Amino acid sequence: MQNDVLARWEQVLIRLEKQVNKHSFETWLTKCKPVAFYDNTIIIEVPDHFSKSWLADRYAPIIKQAYESIMHQEISLQFILAGQEVDQPKPKERSSEETYINILNPRYTFDTFVVGNSNRFAHAASLAVAESPAKAYNPLFIYGGVGLGKTHLMHAIGHYILENNQNLKVAYVTSEKFTNELINSIRDDQTVEFRNKYRSMDILLIDDIQFLEKKERTQEEFFHTFNTLYEANKQIIISSDRPPKEIATLEDRLRSRFEWGLITDMQSPDYETRVAILRKKAQLEAIKNIPDETIAYIADKIQSNIRELEGALIRVSAFSSLEQRDATPQLAAEVLKDVIAPSKPKIITTPLIMQTVADFYGLRIEDLKAKKRTRSVAFPRQVAMYLARELTDLSLPKIGDEFGGRDHTTVLHACDKITTDLSSDPVLQETIKELKKRIGE
């Protein structure tokens, strides 16, 4: 099998050459090679620290996808420096009942997580759950925007539990993978095996639960899995890009169960936290060519999420090294100009607002214009009307016309309701804040 994996690198390269530009392909991909394969992990050798970081952050997903499509099995990747020995783990003793563990990212631990005002509560709750599974908060529901560290905390919980409770069975899975496994089990008449796998876990971490919306069969299956684990006093940790009550087509019985435990959110990091994140990333990746003033510049200019922040650091460091130029703030401005360059003011229209709100709640624009009065549609419609009044110069009658020809009093009622709710609902406050951010991007 190992020789087969190594031999297929040429096939992988052929696929990758079609997906990236010629300069990137020759700079990054032709200079690395697979050197070992064990435990479903392909070890890829790279020439230096910069290549290691760049490949891991930018190209790992497409390399993994190419290998999996060729090999027809799931694999993981690990990048090592040229000349570095490959430490093959010794097989662990297993009990007679096999433990199922979905591979956790070794980078995502509590030690590598930077705590700030934007994530302090979520971090504390995650650590409490890791230290006392099923005794602190069950379930733990973590929500926040893309790239803010939810998955990092999920993996950190898994790592901590496994390090301190080796006999516990831990499963990390995305809702998309859970759905695909369910579909495959139905196709192959193996639903019993599928259920036994997840319902025998001690710890279940399920990421991006919002992707279960509109998937009725998957929601049904997860409902029973949740009940089985909860009644057996097993720990459940869930992440989402929004709180349970904002997942429009989520079944009420699932929503209520998610609200049984603790719900905590993660916000965009403030300036001080962004600086700390960049310094931690530089330390972990052995990046020594970025001075403090350049770190400060990047932290000031990249405010969206942690993923883009760390990507900017790697990009500046790699460019500085390859071009043999000092990593000054001026160089950073040059390298990141496509990310931070000032753009023309965006024209905000009602259709843009409706599309953004519809996407957020898992609806269609037609739903917002229709006569449906169910809460799963009526509330998002009221939010969209409120934003239309806040962000455009349209009159109430004009806004009503945009929403399927509704009367101006309907628009006024919607705006008044959302305004009133905002005064006492912190979750709605964050939702409006997030929607305004998406509309303005």
Curated annotation (Swiss-Prot):
Keyword RNA-binding part of the UniProt annotation: no
GO BP annotation list: DNA replication initiation; regulation of DNA replication
Cellular compartments annotated: Cytoplasm
One Gene Ontology molecular-function label: lipid binding
Residue span of region Domain II: 80-102
PROSITE patterns given in the database record: DNAA
Domain comment (free text): Domain I is involved in oligomerization and binding regulators, domain II is flexibile and of varying length in different bacteria, domain III forms the AAA+ region, while domain IV binds dsDNA.
Record text on subunit structure and interactions: Oligomerizes as a right-handed, spiral filament on DNA at oriC.
Protein name: Chromosomal replication initiator protein DnaA
Gene name for this UniProt entry: dnaA
